[in-house]
């Protein structure tokens, strides 16, 4: 998103406190340890999964995280599937890296995954999902998530699961792809 709200006073006060304290220089490239530890603890508390602090990388935003993830996982010419409609940054970043984008469209009359359709895409290097979906808000069921995870594992396809909007599903408790295994 692109929020237009003002910076809260609490944040401004903390920045001023740190500047007065004389903290200068760069943070570690993967983020400060206390923050990475808190995120690891959050995954344990929220999803009951162990995520080592070493697997957590802090970025300046989601697009930076996607760029790093794509650079780490894919090479020029790889084929990566996205489920439409989709957050445009996925497509744009992948194309800028000369990665072939394979667009999977849902059945126009359904809001669920057509498993038979997906079986046609075994020759992929990667799959990117957004849950809940950005922009339409569609939420994958546990069955759908598990299917996608197992499909990718079976065919050795790298899976990137964008779960940034998990906190705004109101009455739904969503699972992370990590609930089905560590290969995501």
Region locations from a protein language model:
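N-terminal small-domain helix-loop-helix segment of the aminotransferase-like
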Residues: 1-61, 68
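Short glycine-rich anion-binding loops that position phosphate/pyrophosphate groups of nucleotides
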Residues: 3, 63, 131-135
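Active-site phosphate-binding strand-loop segment of PLP-dependent enzymes
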Residues: 108-172, 178
């Amino acid at each position: 998103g692109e929020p237009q709200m003002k910076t809260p006073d609490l944040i401004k006060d903390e920045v001023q406190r740190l500047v007065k304290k004389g903290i200068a220089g760069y943070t570690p490239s993967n983020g400060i340890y206390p923050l990475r530890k808190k995120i690891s603890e959050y995954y344990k508390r929220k999803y009951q999964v162990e995520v080592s602090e070493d697997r957590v990388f802090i970025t300046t935003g989601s697009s930076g995280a996607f760029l790093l993830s794509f650079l780490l996982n894919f090479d020029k010419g790889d084929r990566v599937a996205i489920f439409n409609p989709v957050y445009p940054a996925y497509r744009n970043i992948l194309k800028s890296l000369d990665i072939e984008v394979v667009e999977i469209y849902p059945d126009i009359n359904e809001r669920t995954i057509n498993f038979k359709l997906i079986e046609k895409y075994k020759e992929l290097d990667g799959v990117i999902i957004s849950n809940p979906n950005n922009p339409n808000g569609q939420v994958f069921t546990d069955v759908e998530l598990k299917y996608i995870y197992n499909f990718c594992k079976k065919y050795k396809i790298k899976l990137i699961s964008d779960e940034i909007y998990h906190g705004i599903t109101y009455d739904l408790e969503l699972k992370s792809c990590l609930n089905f295994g560590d290969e995501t």
